[in-house]
Curated annotation (Swiss-Prot):
Task of the protein: Splits dipeptides with a prolyl residue in the C-terminal position.
Protein's UniProt name: Xaa-Pro dipeptidase
UniProt-listed Gene3D superfamilies: Creatinase/methionine aminopeptidase superfamily, Creatinase/prolidase N-terminal domain
Catalytic activity field: Xaa-L-Pro dipeptide + H2O = an L-alpha-amino acid + L-proline
Protein source organism: Escherichia coli O81 (strain ED1a)
Keywords: Dipeptidase, Hydrolase, Manganese, Metal-binding, Metalloprotease, Protease
GO-annotated molecular function: aminopeptidase activity; metal ion binding; metalloexopeptidase activity; phosphoric triester hydrolase activity; proline dipeptidase activity
Homology family: Belongs to the peptidase M24B family. Bacterial-type prolidase subfamily.
Textual note on the cofactor: Binds 2 manganese ions per subunit.
Cofactor: Mn(2+)
Protein EC: 3.4.13.9
Length: 443
């Protein structure tokens, strides 16, 4: 494999080209990209955990340092002012010296408010991208050039197409997350609580709970019916029935986002349903290719859900086509088939049809779908189907013409297991689809 340094060099060349095009289109001279700042909790002197501006970490793998600035014009070497205070209260990151620093001019910034004297004097044609608009105004940036929508839409659109450097980072994030999932399954099998399973996961991935790309979903039994369950019970349940883990990792600012579901016993209907969802997920991925709308794959999986509802006699005396047509599959899979993935877990531009930001909304029947793009080489997406037993979604179906088709006794028997979700991260290539997750043998 090419070294990360050579991949990064090509990555920077790609970002420079995109920057040149964006600046020419919107008649700007340069972009000033701010890593961000620490913000204190209300009425406190303690800051929230720092989360870097994703447009900043697209350029440099600096994810933990506030008050940094990048100046890019698409022609000259990117200039990074790296915050390096004299501070005996807090840890100070040293000036970077790594695989990427040859391609960026790195300058120490000893005082956060010292950036103003270091920037070009003429700033009327510089665009600011960052989370603190008032800081940009203080620096003399024109209000109309603060987070200009056209520029951001343009950059977001092309972020969908990952460079080889980005894919290399995402494969490393996969490795970390896979290690975590294996450790978490072992913790589940040994009878640990959600809280302790989460600690096992973080230990295996080398993350703190503030460093993972999203809050880990560690859900035992009926908690698996809560799509974004993040409570973490300290006490293990008396009976272990099921375990849903939706947890990722981050490498150089790039995310992995994986989900697995396990049954405590291998000889019940729930365990067979887990296996069947897994098989259907893999079967769907095997059909994926460039040139097809992501929406089509979402709709296709509802047809696969119907097949499983029929096989397991959860819905009876109704054709699979009628189930989908009348949305009887809807309460069982109330989320999209997945989403774009990259610098952010729910990565940007899922609805953008072109680099002008043309928006194509999700279908009215599936408003929670996060992507309506035509799949193209370089895109990275999650494929994460599920089947859940959520009373608030099932309740409206307990009355009316379709109620008789629901096997309510079977549903009640499955509700204590919560639900099932299986999630892999895939890369669209010209002639194939790479499953980064399964390539690491995560069952």
């Amino acid at each position: 494999m090419e070294s990360l340094a050579s991949l990064y060099k090509n990555h920077i060349a790609t970002l420079q080209e995109r920057t040149r095009d964006a600046l020419a289109r919107f008649k700007l001279d340069a972009l000033l990209i701010h890593s961000g700042e620490l913000f204190n909790v209300f009425l406190d002197d303690h800051p929230y955990p720092f989360k870097v501006n994703p447009q900043f970490k697209a350029w440099v793998p600096v994810t933990q340092v506030p008050n940094c600035w990048l100046l890019v014009d698409g022609v000259n070497k990117p200039k990074l002012w790296f915050y390096l205070p004299v501070d005996y209260w807090h840890n100070v990151e040293p000036l970077p010296n790594s695989f990427w620093t040859e391609d960026v001019e790195v300058i120490a910034l000893p005082k956060a408010d010292g950036i103003g004297s270091l920037l070009p004097a003429a700033r009327g044609n510089i665009g600011y991208i960052g989370p603190v608009p008032e800081r940009a105004l203080q620096l003399g940036i024109e209000a109309s050039n603060i987070n200009p929508k056209g520029v951001i839409d343009y950059l977001h659109y092309y972020r969908s197409f990952k460079t080889e450097y980005e894919l290399a980072c995402m494969r490393e994030a996969q490795k970390m997350a896979v290690n975590g999932h294996r450790a978490a399954e072992e913790a589940f099998r040994s009878g640990m609580s959600e809280f302790d399973i989460n600690i096992a996961y973080l230990t295996a991935t080398g993350h703190r709970d503030t460093d993972v790309p999203y809050s880990n979903i560690v859900a035992l039994n009926e908690h698996a019916a809560v799509l974004h369950y993040t409570k973490l019970d300290h006490q293990a349940p008396e009976e272990m029935r099921s375990f849903l883990l939706d947890a990722g990792a981050e490498y150089n600012g790039y995310a992995a986002d994986l989900t697995r579901t396990w049954s405590a016993k291998s000889d019940n209907d729930y365990a067979q349903l887990v296996k069947d969802v897994n098989d259907e997920q893999l079967a769907l991925i095997a059909t994926m290719k460039a040139g097809v709308s992501y929406v089509d794959y979402h709709i296709q999986f509802h047809q696969r859900i119907a097949k499983l509802l029929r096989k397991h006699q959860i819905i009876t005396d109704m054709s699979e086509e009628a189930m989908v047509e009348n949305d009887l599959t809807g309460p069982f899979m109330p989320h999209g088939i997945g989403h774009p993935l990259g610098l952010q877990v729910h990565d940007v531009a899922g609805f953008m049809q072109d680099d002008s930001g043309t928006h194509l909304a999700a279908p009215a029947r599936y408003p929670y779908l996060r992507c309506t793009r035509i799949l193209q080489p370089g895109m990275v997406l999650t494929i994460e189907p599920g089947i859940y037993f959520i009373e608030s979604l099932l309740a409206p179906w307990r009355e009316g013409q379709f109620s008789k088709h629901f096997n309510w006794q079977k549903i009640e028997a499955l509700k204590p297991f919560g639900g099932i979700r299986i999630e892999d991260n895939v890369v669209i290539h010209e002639n194939n689809v790479e499953n980064m997750t399964r390539d690491l043998k995560l069952a």
